[in-house]
Swiss-Prot record:
This is Large ribosomal subunit protein bL31. SUPFAM superfamilies: L28p-like. Belongs to the bacterial ribosomal protein bL31 family. Type A subfamily. It comes from the Bacteria. InterPro entries: Ribosomal_bL28/bL31-like_sf, Ribosomal_bL31, Ribosomal_bL31_A, Ribosomal_bL31_sf. PANTHER family: 50S RIBOSOMAL PROTEIN L31, CHLOROPLASTIC, LARGE RIBOSOMAL SUBUNIT PROTEIN BL31A. It comes from Thioalkalivibrio sulfidiphilus (strain HL-EbGR7). GO terms for biological process: translation. Binds 1 zinc ion per subunit. Its cofactor is Zn(2+).
Length: 67
């Protein structure tokens, strides 16, 4: 790697709106970062995501277009 062309890579304290705190390394220029969603409260990671009723949507489409 060439010297003096890469951004500073340092430790950053991340705070989520749910109250979760963790540290990571980043090129973010501040020492603290506030986020709205993290892996502790995101629906994908918590398993509380809404499952879309695709079968109902297909039936609705077929009724609408006479298939």
């Amino acid at each position: 790697m060439k010297p003096d062309i890469h951004p500073d890579y340092h430790e950053v304290a991340v705070t989520c709106s749910c109250g979760n705190n963790f540290k990571t390394r980043s090129t973010y220029q501040g020492s603290e970062l506030n986020v709205e969603v993290c892996s502790a409260c995101h629906p994908f990671f918590t398993g509380k995501q809404k499952i879309m009723d695709t079968a109902g949507q297909v039936d609705k489409f077929r009724r609408r277009y006479g298939m």
